[in-house]
Regions:
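A short, Lys/Arg-enriched amphipathic alpha-helix followed by its capping loop at the start of a domain
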Residues: 9-20
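Anion-binding alpha/beta catalytic cores of soluble intermediary-metabolism enzymes, centered on
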Residues: 1-4, 18, 23-25, 30-168
Length: 168
C-alpha cells in the first residue's frame, strides 16, 4: 500500500501546487517492504542520504503481512526507525479533539469529557522503546516463554521531548 498511497498524495500535492502557484519536485526511492523486495534491506544508505538532502520526505505505509516473518533487524519498520534517527525526527505530535456533538460516540465518561476536549499528545519517537532490546526467552520460573521490552531513556531524550511539548 505504500507506493499507492504516496502516488495519491503526490496528486493531492500537485493540485495544491496548482491552486497556490507552487511546483513540487519528486524523487522516488524505496524504503520499508518495497526496499526489502528490491534490495534485501528495509533502508539503503542511498535512500538515507537522499532524504537528508531533501526539503521533505513523503512516506507511505511501512509494511504488511508479506514481511511478517523477516528477522527483526530486517523488518519494514526498521526503515522508519532508521529515517527518524538519521533525520533527527524525535517528536510525534498527535492532536485529538472531541466535540460535544460527538460525545455519545466517545468511550470516555461524559463527566470526564464535559463539553469536549482539545489536547495534543507529544510522544518521543527515537528513544529506547523503539531501539531498546526486546524479544522472547524462556522464563526462569517455569512460566514458559516470556516477552521482554527494555526501555531506557537518557536525560537528554527526556528533556528534548519535554521541551518540544512545552514549546507548542
Amino acid at each position: 500500500v505504500g507506493p499507492e498511497i504516496v502516488t495519491e498524495a503526490m496528486l493531492v500535492l500537485d493540485k495544491v501546487g496548482e491552486k497556490f502557484g507552487h511546483t513540487f519536485n519528486y524523487n522516488e526511492f524505496l524504503a520499508c517492504g518495497c526496499s526489502i523486495d528490491a534490495n534485501g534491506v528495509p533502508l539503503t544508505e542511498e535512500t538515507i542520504e537522499i532524504c537528508k538532502n531533501a526539503d521533505s520526505v513523503l512516506l507511505g505505509a511501512v509494511g504488511g503481512p508479506k514481511w511478517d516473518n523477516q528477522p527483526s533487524q530486517n523488518r519494514p519498520e526498521k526503515a522508519l526507525l532508521g529515517l527518524r534517527a538519521a533525520l533527527g525526527l524525535f517528536a510525534n505530535i498527535r492532536p485529538a479533539m472531541m466535540y460535544k456533538a460527538l460525545a455519545d460516540a466517545c468511550p470516555i465518561k461524559p463527566e470526564i469529557i464535559g463539553d469536549g476536549f482539545d489536547i495534543v499528545v507529544c510522544r518521543e519517537l527515537t528513544g529506547d522503546v523503539y531501539f531498546g532490546e526486546h524479544g522472547r526467552r524462556e522464563s526462569t520460573n517455569n512460566w514458559g516463554v516470556v516477552g521482554y521490552d527494555d526501555m531506557n531513556y537518557s536525560v537528554y531524550e527526556v528533556e528534548r521531548i519535554a521541551r518540544r511539548a512545552f514549546e507548542m
